[in-house]
Regions:
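Substrate-binding cleft/loops of secretory-pathway carbohydrate-active enzymes
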Residues: 160, 165-171, 182, 186, ...
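Glycan-recognition and processing domains
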Residues: 376-487, 576
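N-terminal substrate-binding region of glycoside hydrolase catalytic domains
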Residues: 22-125, 281, 286-290, 294, ...
Length: 580
């Protein structure tokens, strides 16, 4: 036992490496929608890229030193048989077996009431006996994984670390009633325990014989509330890991206009989309959020914009809970899963086959440049008056606040309790959602629109939530778009398919789509005359002479041009190419 305890502590001193050499090795073909469990067959749900194995410690080691890996074997076999991917995790902490308390691990009772009936108490993680048995568990876990043939190990995309209570990485739910056992999430003692556990996983799964397996971490950097308390953990990872790793970061795919989402974009996206040096992957889950009041206002719409929001932030894996998977076909939101799959693995512009730009504007009350304090009031997350003034500025375009109380909520409480759509918020994403296709001077050439066609109801089309349009009265009669500079490399003619979703709002209204064909003047792909159906339509065109090297007006590759004095509305523009 002394040897294992020494090992647990000493592992934190593994050699250091340069962060620029760390590149996640999860195959891009694994990026997409996953089964949060392992009960679904990809034949029935063809959008599934992978499944998960998550077992409580108590089920794996019912008696001290006797390990039952039969459920793990079945999960690996299923992934191998279906040619799908798998990620692994073990629930520790309150999911430990009862016998550890007979081996000298103190029970810790907390003041938590929300999880009563699920967890009555927790182990004291710093107890020598707990460290001993935890280390043995992870060591045996790794030994068993390494016993699989290489072709089966290759189906394991990554392993999620859980050092505390669930994957949220806290020692307890609530505070310990006995102050001797208190372990706040940011306390030095808990941080030391976590870093020792990190080192144990690195040694077990990324060093020694066998294929190194990527690891997934949570609470290792800033979060949606701008909390930077985990920078020491981040520093440890980027100086000690040689192999790839990912982050668990759940806000973006669970909604849109969530407090603090802009901070998550700014912190992580550079490591996820077109990364330079350090390359990560990002997992998020859809838990029971989809059954909460806000999501239920319009389930297909909520899933769609959650997918778009997540893709804009570089999410790689979207782990969907059982109830949502079962309902997806019946309620018509599985199309969002296919959309997510289409773009999740498109992280390098040189090799991407597709690009999109979903037109949107979020009114970020934290932005004092866009919304000066002398006009709208002091910038503060508690200043609801400022948020309402900003919204009023755009009310003529459909901007609105349905739930004032939610403006003061954190993003977790938003997902749980929000009861309406808000077009303003604190640190929300302000611009279009996109992947390698960008609108040029969006606010100077178009107007943002919200709730197109009227209030959002359960039957509103998914595109009704956000859009952009012409405004002839203010001279905004053309919208310009450009692809990433490295999406195309030469000036040769190429075969390109364009897909556009637009709103047919006015009979007789005319507009056209132009593209860069390498000529001095942009070429017309198609023209449209509206019928005034008040419905969303889509149009797809395949071009054989597209150059798209920013040779159009304002350096654009594609343009939407108004050809009369009536205003037109658009939702999403997509570009597809076939690679040689």
């Amino acid at each position: 036992m002394r040897h294992i305890l020494f090992l647990f502590t000493a592992l934190a001193l593994v050699c250091t490496y340069s962060a620029t050499n760390i590149k996640a090795e999860v195959p891009l073909t694994a990026f997409g929608v996953w089964d949060r469990g392992s009960s679904f067959d990809p034949k029935d749900y063809p959008f599934l890229k992978g499944l998960s194995f998550n077992a409580p410690w108590a089920d794996v080691e019912r008696q001290p030193g006797l390990f039952d890996w039969s459920d793990l074997d079945q999960a690996v076999e299923k992934a191998f048989r279906n040619k799908s991917f798998l990620y692994l995790s073990l629930g520790v902490g309150p999911e430990a077996p009862e016998w550890i308390y007979e081996k000298g691990v103190p029970k810790v009772f907390t003041d938590d009431t929300r999880h009563q009936g699920k967890w009555e108490y927790y182990p004291y993680y710093l107890a020598p006996a707990y460290k001993f048995h935890f280390t043995r568990l992870i060591t045996e876990f790794g030994r068993h994984v390494r016993s699989y043939p290489r072709d089966k190990q290759d189906r394991i995309a990554f392993i999620q670390l859980k050092t505390g209570c669930t994957g949220d990485e806290a020692a307890y739910k609530g505070a310990a009633k006995d102050p001797r056992y208190e372990l706040p999430k940011t306390s030095p003692a808990w941080r030391t325990f976590r870093l020792e556990a990190f080192a144990l996983f690195v040694k077990t799964f990324q060093q020694g014989p066998g294929r190194p397996i990527d690891l997934l971490f949570n609470s290792v950097g800033g979060d949606a509330d701008g909390d930077e308390r985990y920078t020491e953990e981040w520093g440890w990872l980027t100086t000690h890991l040689k192999q790839g790793f990912g982050i668990k970061n759940g806000a973006l795919s669970r909604g849109h206009h969530l407090k603090g989402e802009r901070a998550l974009y700014e912190q992580w996206t550079k490591f996820l989309i077109d990364p330079k040096g350090l390359t990560l992957f990002r997992r998020s889950e859809m838990d029971q959020t989809w059954r909460k009041p806000w999501y239920q206002l319009n389930v297909p719409l909520s899933f769609y914009w959650g997918a778009v929001n997540a893709l804009n932030g570089g999410q790689s894996v979207w782990d969907i809970t059982k109830s949502a998977l079962e309902a997806s076909k019946e309620e018509g939101f599985d199309s969002s899963f296919y959309f997510f799959n289409k773009y999740a693995g498109q992280i390098h512009p040189e090799t991407a086959t597709d690009a999109f730009c979903a037109l949107h504007k979020g009114l970020d009350a934290a932005d004092t440049k866009a919304y000066p304090e002398d006009k709208f009031g002091k910038a503060s997350p508690q200043n609801v008056s400022r948020m309402l003034k900003i919204t009023e500025e755009y009310a003529r375009y459909g901007a609105k606040v349905d739930d004032k109380d939610a403006l003061l909520m954190g993003q977790v409480e938003q997902r749980r309790s929000q009861e309406g759509f808000n077009d303003v918020g604190w640190q929300i994403w302000p611009d279009n959602y996109s992947r390698f296709l960008y609108q040029i001077d969006a606010d100077k050439t178009s107007v943002p629109l919200w709730r197109v066609g009227g209030p959002i109801t359960k039957s509103s089309p998914i595109y009704a939530r956000f859009a952009r349009g012409f405004e002839h009265a203010s001279g905004k009669d053309a919208m310009y778009f450009k692809l990433h500079d490295r999406f195309f490399k030469d000036d040769k003619a190429k075969v390109v398919t364009i897909h556009l979703v637009w709103y047919d709002g006015r009979e007789g209204s005319t507009w056209k789509l132009l593209y860069d064909a390498g000529d001095p003047v942009m070429k017309t792909a198609f023209s449209v005359t509206g019928a005034g159906t008040k419905k969303w339509h889509d149009k797809t065109v395949t071009l054989t002479d597209a150059v798209m090297r920013h040779g159009g007006t304002r350096g654009s590759d594609i343009a939407l041009v108004n050809t009369d004095d009536r205003d037109d509305i658009f939702s999403i523009l997509e570009v597809h190419r076939d690679l040689p």
